[in-house]
UniProtKB/Swiss-Prot annotation:
Pfam families membership: Cytochrome_B
Cofactor field: heme b; heme c
Name of the protein in its database record: Cytochrome b6
Gene Ontology biological process terms in this record: photosynthesis; respiratory electron transport chain
Length: 215
C-alpha cells in the first residue's frame, strides 16, 4: 500500500493538500452555531443520496406517480425508510439554513469583504425553497396537485408577462403531465446542479476569506 500511496504522492502531492486543509486557522470565538452551514450541506448530501435511490422506482407520469410512491413506501426494500429520511432531511435542511442565515446576520458575516459570500448564500436559500416546491408535487396526490396549481398560478397577476410565465412553468395552459415532467426535471437535475455549483462557490469564498471575526 505504501508504494501505491508514494506513487500518487509523487504526482499529486496529497500530503501537502491535506496539510493545507487541516491547518486552516479557526478563530477562538467560533462555537457550535458556526456549524449550521456544514449541517445544511450534510442534509443536502443525504437528500442527493436518498433522492437518487428513489429514482429507481419513481415514475414521473400523472397516471403512475402516486402508485409508484405507494410502491416505494409499502413494497420496495427499505423504501419507507429511504423516503422518510428524504423528507426528514429536507425539513432539517430548511431549518438549518434558516438558523444559519440568522447566525450570519447577527454576527455580521455579510459585511465587507464577504458580500459575495452572502449573495451566494441568498441564492442557495432560493434554491432550497425551490426544492420544497418542486418536490412537494412529485407524489401527484391531491395536496401536491393543488399546491402546484396555486404556486404556478401566482405569476398570472403580473401585467403583460404573467400569462406567458404561467404557461412556461406549467408547460401548457393547465396543470398536467407537462407540469409534472418539468417539476421532476427541476427537482432531480437542474436544482441539484445549481445548488452544487453555488455551494462550491460559497465554500471557496469562505475558504479564501476565512470566518468573520466577532462583533
Amino acid at each position: 500500500m505504501s508504494k501505491v500511496y508514494d506513487w500518487f504522492e509523487e504526482r499529486l502531492e496529497i500530503q501537502a493538500i491535506a496539510d493545507d486543509i487541516t491547518s486552516k486557522y479557526v478563530p477562538p470565538h467560533v462555537n457550535i452555531f458556526y456549524c449550521l452551514g456544514g449541517i445544511t450541506l450534510t442534509c443536502f448530501l443525504v437528500q442527493v443520496a436518498t433522492g437518487f435511490a428513489m429514482t429507481f422506482y419513481y415514475r414521473p407520469t400523472v397516471t403512475e406517480a402516486f402508485a409508484s410512491v405507494q410502491y416505494i413506501m409499502t413494497e420496495a426494500n427499505f423504501g419507507w425508510l429511504i423516503r422518510s429520511v428524504h423528507r426528514w432531511s429536507a425539513s432539517m435542511m430548511v431549518l438549518m439554513m434558516i438558523l444559519h442565515v440568522f447566525r450570519v446576520y447577527l454576527t455580521g458575516g455579510f459585511k465587507k469583504p464577504r458580500e459575495l459570500t452572502w449573495v451566494t448564500g441568498v441564492v442557495l436559500g432560493v434554491l432550497t425553497a425551490s426544492f420544497g416546491v418542486t418536490g412537494y408535487s412529485l407524489p401527484w396526490d391531491q395536496i401536491g396537485y393543488w399546491a402546484v396549481k396555486i404556486v404556478t398560478g401566482v405569476p398570472d397577476a403580473i401585467p403583460v408577462i404573467g400569462s406567458p410565465l404561467v404557461e412556461l412553468l406549467r408547460g401548457s395552459a393547465s396543470v398536467g403531465q407537462s407540469t409534472l415532467t418539468r417539476f421532476y426535471s427541476l427537482h432531480t437535475f437542474v436544482l441539484p446542479l445549481l445548488t452544487a455549483v453555488f455551494m462550491l462557490m460559497h465554500f471557496l469564498m469562505i475558504r479564501k476569506q476565512g470566518i468573520s471575526g466577532p462583533l
